[in-house]
Amino acid sequence: MEGSFSDGGALPEGLAEEAEPQGAAWSGDSGTVSQSHSSASGPWEDEGAEDGAPGRDLPLLRRAAAGYAACLLPGAGARPEVEALDASLEDLLTRVDEFVGMLDMLRGDSSHVVSEGVPRIHAKAAEMRRIYSRIDRLEAFVRMVGGRVARMEEQVTKAEAELGTFPRAFKKLLHTMNVPSLFSKSAPSRPQQAGYEAPVLFRTEDYFPCCSERPQL
């Protein structure tokens, strides 16, 4: 009978309308799962299924992955290329550490020179300026002494020219001899000379006082 559910007949209209969307949903889910399964399968399987050789590129991919893993990942037996790279990197790191240490040393020396050396050099420069001033005064003193000595030599030369120079031994010989008075002649009278005026000389004490006092140059 139409509309009876227990006899295995057709469902009522309301139940039939609810059952149709559920069936469509089930069919849609099954289609999605099958489609995802087909998309999850590798491209080599599709091409292999088409060409008749399933998974022909899989060994090649595995070998490539193993080669990259051997190069990049550490293993029990390191390859020569990896060992050479490690050695070069260690050498490079050592040189970088040495360079950084040298830079630190230079930075420390520069700061030491700026903080201690420059003030010391400035103080020495001021002291050298004082020494140069003393040297200038000493040179002026030497020139003054040279001028005084030159004037003294001129006066000595002039006195020798006026008084004459006679050997001392010959003078003694003449004093011991008795010459008759008739042979003696009156010595011509010499003109009276002016008195000797000693030149003005410097005093060393004025320029070089005692050791207890500081020299005044």
UniProtKB/Swiss-Prot annotation:
PANTHER family to which the protein is assigned, alphabetical: BIOGENESIS OF LYSOSOME-RELATED ORGANELLES COMPLEX 1 SUBUNIT 4 (PTHR16230:SF4), CAPPUCCINO (PTHR16230)
InterPro entries recorded: Cappuccino
Modified residues (Phosphothreonine): 165
Region (Disordered): 1-57
Ranges of compositional bias, category Polar residues: 29-41
Known role: Component of the BLOC-1 complex, a complex that is required for normal biogenesis of lysosome-related organelles (LRO), such as platelet dense granules and melanosomes. In concert with the AP-3 complex, the BLOC-1 complex is required to target membrane protein cargos into vesicles assembled at cell bodies for delivery into neurites and nerve terminals. The BLOC-1 complex, in association with SNARE proteins, is also proposed to be involved in neurite extension. Plays a role in intracellular vesicle trafficking.
Keyword Coiled coil attached: yes
Coiled-coil region: 136-165
Family as reported in the entry's similarity comment: Belongs to the BLOC1S4 family.
The gene coding this protein: BLOC1S4
Compartments in which it is found: Cytoplasm
Identification of the protein by name: Biogenesis of lysosome-related organelles complex 1 subunit 4
Keywords: Coiled coil, Cytoplasm, Phosphoprotein
GO biological process, one term: melanosome organization
Protein's organism: Homo sapiens
A GO CC term attached to the entry: cytoplasm
